[in-house]
């Protein structure tokens, strides 16, 4: 399909309007300009407001999960109002609308969670009964697993908002994705980087995913030079794991795949929301089999945890 935006010579990128989302869209534009020798005016960035951005007073798990950050943008993509959409992959549901796919992943930034502490530099050093802000069920469960004494409070809003709340003394610390902070030039606020062994990240964390229309070969050809092989393999594994567990913002699921040559290694974890129970798996296999490795890891954990473990999941 050749859209109007290509006919008039402008490539249109859809994105959320937050500073972080725009930084990711600008990074995508920069790479496209470099790959094809395009001038800046050949690529238009179109910020869009999503339900996830507008509803800031409740946890995502209460209001519908990950699709809240993508629905309006994906509709614009389906309608041909934009040519591609730039996303934080960790915010992407595993089931996409008919006719759309994640065609390219840019090289992944550091996938770890970053701790920003006000009264201590590390989670484990916070005083007894301290408060930590997080809106992620995964982070909440991991915090409670490591520090059952800590009070976890819902912490919505963009990065600047959360950092302001922290500075104002609303909480003693918070976790944010290291990649997002670095993309915003805020890496210096990080007081500790979470150990992915004990505090594994969300599947897809740190990776920019580009969504296009299936069959739009012109756009996919333009994007092909931006694709990063190892990131694509890792995310195939992580997203298959997430899909097999029916993962969304409503469920505490962690997973990280790393690629070394032709081998993919995967560490996955599922937790009860209160952190009282967790099950994990470490496995590896051929990179060509990445998605199957993720699926098998999920099936293993589902069997290991037993049906009662999932009763609280929606």
UniProtKB/Swiss-Prot annotation:
Protein name in the entry: Porphobilinogen deaminase
Origin: domain of life: Bacteria
Enzyme class: transferase
Function statement: Tetrapolymerization of the monopyrrole PBG into the hydroxymethylbilane pre-uroporphyrinogen in several discrete steps.
UniProt EC number: 2.5.1.61
Pfam families (UniProt xref): Porphobil_deam, Porphobil_deamC
GO cellular component annotations of the record: cytoplasm
Known partners and oligomeric status: Monomer.
Pathway this chain belongs to: Porphyrin-containing compound metabolism; protoporphyrin-IX biosynthesis; coproporphyrinogen-III from 5-aminolevulinate: step 2/4
Keywords, alphabetical: Porphyrin biosynthesis, Transferase
HAMAP family with a match to the protein in the record: Porphobil_deam
Catalytic activity of the protein: 4 porphobilinogen + H2O = hydroxymethylbilane + 4 NH4(+)
Positions bearing S-(dipyrrolylmethanemethyl)cysteine: 249
Cofactor(s) listed in the protein's UniProt record: dipyrromethane
Gene Ontology terms for molecular function: hydroxymethylbilane synthase activity
Transferase keyword on record: yes
Note accompanying the cofactor annotation: Binds 1 dipyrromethane group covalently.
Miscellaneous: The porphobilinogen subunits are added to the dipyrromethane group.
Alphabetical list of Gene3D superfamilies matching this protein: Periplasmic binding protein-like II, Porphobilinogen deaminase, C-terminal domain
